[in-house]
């Protein structure tokens, strides 16, 4: 997966791409960056980084971030089955 595919998948799931920052952004929110030896995903809040996870490729990092964001924000969740009452 590349960045364009990642952004398209976010949009498909009703997630605004603006919540993700790339590279050495100082924005709060969700971040993906290339470190010296690996790609990293993490969240930044009030200038502090949390939940930093390393990956061998950008594609792996993007897939992980997509999975996490879909689990949190996706609006296309299957509705629970409704049970019929029998008389």
Residue ranges, per PLM feature:
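Short, solvent-exposed secondary-structure capping/transition elements
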Residues: 73-78
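A short, charged, amphipathic alpha-helix used as a generic interaction element across diverse proteins
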Residues: 54-72
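Short aromatic-glycine-(Arg/Gly/Cys) micro-motifs in beta-strand/loop hairpins
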Residues: 24-50, 68
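Negatively charged, low-complexity tracts enriched in Asp/Glu with abundant Ser/Thr
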Residues: 1-24, 56, 79-85
